[in-house]
């Protein structure tokens, strides 16, 4: 993966973007009074906006649309953002409950070929993020060794290069076979 140096992202830029995203989430919840899916891509390293992250975002948005068609849930509003910090989306979905919506998003994360690269947060109308633990689901597994992903990330068990090579392989395989 080659990268343009201007697209490198610092930790400060990531944290600032997260603050802005939280504010935007609040505005969306106020405007629609329905659960909100806040979709970001899990991409290690300093380059968050690349072909692989775009492939993951496109695949995730298709999966959400297919879910809505299959369940009869209505997608009320949607916004895609292409930020230097990576692609993002806000999707307001009229589902029976935020917890049912979270279970459906976790199913996408679990079963979609690129699901492990998707971060599909569900925020209820009161602004609370519904967590994996709250839904009694295990934490994410590492892409490379199947251990707890949080532990691998904190200990830097794998190099960014090894993780990016795996992501490149996953998105290539998906693009070829989808």
From Swiss-Prot:
GO biological process per UniProt: prosthetic group biosynthetic process
Reaction(s) catalysed (UniProt annotation): apo-[citrate lyase ACP] + 2'-(5''-triphospho-alpha-D-ribosyl)-3'-dephospho-CoA = holo-[citrate lyase ACP] + diphosphate
GO MF, one example: holo-citrate lyase synthase activity
Pfam families with a match to the protein in the record: CitX
Source species, domain of life: Bacteria
InterPro entries the UniProt entry points to: CitX
Keyword set includes DNA repair: no
Key words, A-Z: Nucleotidyltransferase, Transferase
EC number: 2.7.7.61
Function: Transfers 2-(5''-triphosphoribosyl)-3'-dephosphocoenzyme-A on a serine residue to the apo-acyl carrier protein (gamma chain) of the citrate lyase to yield holo-acyl carrier protein.
HAMAP family: CitX
Family the UniProt entry places it in: Belongs to the CitX family.
Name of this chain's protein: Probable apo-citrate lyase phosphoribosyl-dephospho-CoA transferase
């Amino acid at each position: 993966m080659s990268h343009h140096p201007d697209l490198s992202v610092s930790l400060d830029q990531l944290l600032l973007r997260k603050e802005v995203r939280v504010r935007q989430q609040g505005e969306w919840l106020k405007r629609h009074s329905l659960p909100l899916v806040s979709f970001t891509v899990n991409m290690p390293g300093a380059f968050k906006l690349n072909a692989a992250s775009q492939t993951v975002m496109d695949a995730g948005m298709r999966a959400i649309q297919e879910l809505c068609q299959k369940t009869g849930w209505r997608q009320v509003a949607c916004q895609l953002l292409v930020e230097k910090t990576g692609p993002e989306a806000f999707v307001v979905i009229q589902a029976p409950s935020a917890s049912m919506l979270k279970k459906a998003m976790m199913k996408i994360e679990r079963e979609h070929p690129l699901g492990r690269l998707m971060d599909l947060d569900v925020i209820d109308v009161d602004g609370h993020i519904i967590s994996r633990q709250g839904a009694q689901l295990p934490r994410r597994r590492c892409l490379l060794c199947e251990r707890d992903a949080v532990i691998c990330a904190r200990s830097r068990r794998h190099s960014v290069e090894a993780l990016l090579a795996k992501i490149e392989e996953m998105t290539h395989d998906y693009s070829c076979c989808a």
